[in-house]
Amino acid sequence: MTQKHPQTLVVDAPLSDAERLKRESNFLRGTIAEDLNDGLTGGFNGDNSTLIRFHGMYQQDDRDIRAERAEEKLEPRYAMMLRCRLPGGIISPEQWLKMDSFASEKTLYGSIRLTNRQTFQFHGILKKDLKTVHHLLHESGLDSLATANDVNRNVLCTSNPVESDLHAEAYEWAKKISEHLLPQTHAYAEIWLDQEKLATTDQEPILGATYLPRKFKTTVVIPPQNDVDIYANDLNFIAISENDQLVGFNVLIGGGLSITIGDKTTHPGVAKDIGYIEKEKVLAVAEAVVTTQRDWGNRSNRKNARLRYTLERVGLDVFKAEVEKRAGVTFEASRPFTLTGRGDRFGWVKGIDNQWHLTLFVENGRLLDYPHRPLKSGIAEIAKVHKGDFRLTANQNLIVAGVSEEDKDTIEKIARDHGLLENISELRKNSMACVSFPTCPLAMAEAERFLPNFLTKVEAVMTKYDIADEYIVFRTTGCPNNCGRSLLAEIGLVGRAIGRYNLYIGGDRVGTRIPRLFRENITEDEILSEVDSLIGRWAKERDGKEAFGDFVVRAGIVKAVTDPAIDFYD
């Protein structure tokens, strides 16, 4: 990253309207409670439709029928998407069964969507059922606070069931970080849980009265796995162990993938290393990074408000020095670590505690009862007999964790009977798509509904070139916000319009390199033609087991992106 001498630590420009909204919200209350009682509309009005995001919900409508309803002079079919706060992705079978019942009985789509941020979403909750789901979450020991908007989002932690002791400690740090950085406002409890308003004035000592300039994403990773995609997140703690004991963390800051097509002041970025800390300093450092971004981040232009842009504006060293000052730490030189891959370990693996763990592939995270493949019911049936826990992965899959030797056969039979243990190609296992249509209001092209059939065609190409057992990290996202993390894939598709995508190639398998734009605004047939040609060359010309992304760079098909702030658009 190019170091700059800061002209000013704070952007001197008029604040965006989002800042007005937060300032006037009375610590995220707005008039949400009044809107809940408005039976004339299925949605929330004005600022409230944005404020509910801080409470973990997005107002959406079914875009498949939007035009039809408009012709009939009806408002869109508004329904809410709710995202649970689940640091580290661990949920008990008892909790899961309650969530499963709600999805079946109280949502328009009857599904549970696993996300690539290790949690789950309900799509299609009617306004009248919102308090029901929040009470259900609360009674189950869960909530949805701060899973969206300008706060620290759900904290990720490597899904590592094998090294159980190390994972347990890393997971506890993920939970502690999540709790430490949560909003302190009582608004969530007042509005959704009917708790009485406190006589004291709300305080937000970490996030501040207007919260953060933009979303903020945090991870804890246990090398060599990079399933949580550390380089795509604002704040990352890389676990360093000695003699199988956690001793501290390397800290990386400033990753992010969202861009705005046509605006070259926006670009993706990979997180940068700022040094090593002892584990006891984690919360102090997390707070210092967040508060420095709170104070220095761009509150004028939301497109340039993420931490990576703050680092570019003030300089990485300046930001690091401020974090050291606020946290009362001095970063040591980073400890060496190695990343070997991002994929999940499917099937049964045995942990050092002699417990078994079964990782199940859930295509694009959608748990639904399909004809002949009742996936959602299968997980529920497993939950009824499972004595361990479930772990949701950052690849949108699910681990049945902590299975005893005597329970293995029972769990496996349920999974197999419900289509949860089918033979899946390596390509498909390493794929990912965001939700996109019909529920996402930002979607420009299909993603989740597009990728499965398209991958079938790519699998045929792999078979044609006799490399069906190989894989490419292949991701699709419906818009440039990049929720599907396409801009850290070997092949990434970014939606531009219905049936059209930008094609990016040249990322690496472990997730350290941004891919480059190869073809712009092309159709599915054109994408398949390009991919066929590229895979053909890779199969023929690669160096041994050279990965696809590394090959297209070495062969000169695209130039590697080395510093996205400078050369992403070259």
Curated annotation (Swiss-Prot):
Similarity comment: family membership: Belongs to the nitrite and sulfite reductase 4Fe-4S domain family.
Cellular compartments per GO CC: sulfite reductase complex (NADPH)
Binding site for [4Fe-4S] cluster: C434, C440, C479, C483
Cross-referenced HAMAP family: CysI
Record's function text: Component of the sulfite reductase complex that catalyzes the 6-electron reduction of sulfite to sulfide. This is one of several activities required for the biosynthesis of L-cysteine from sulfate.
PROSITE patterns in the cross-refs: NIR_SIR
Pathway the protein takes part in: Sulfur metabolism; hydrogen sulfide biosynthesis; hydrogen sulfide from sulfite (NADPH route): step 1/1
Protein name: Sulfite reductase [NADPH] hemoprotein beta-component
Cofactor section: siroheme; [4Fe-4S] cluster
Keywords of the record: 4Fe-4S, Amino-acid biosynthesis, Cysteine biosynthesis, Heme, Iron, Iron-sulfur, Metal-binding, NADP, Oxidoreductase
Taxonomic lineage: Bacteria, Pseudomonadati, Pseudomonadota, Alphaproteobacteria, Sphingomonadales
EC category: oxidoreductase
Note on how the cofactor is bound: Binds 1 siroheme per subunit.
EC number: 1.8.1.2
Positions annotated to bind siroheme: C483
Keyword Oxidoreductase: yes
Biological processes per GO annotation: cysteine biosynthetic process; hydrogen sulfide biosynthetic process; sulfate assimilation
Oligomer and partners: Alpha(8)-beta(8). The alpha component is a flavoprotein, the beta component is a hemoprotein.
Chemical reaction(s) catalysed: hydrogen sulfide + 3 NADP(+) + 3 H2O = sulfite + 3 NADPH + 4 H(+)
Domain of life according to the entry: Bacteria
A GO MF term: 4 iron, 4 sulfur cluster binding
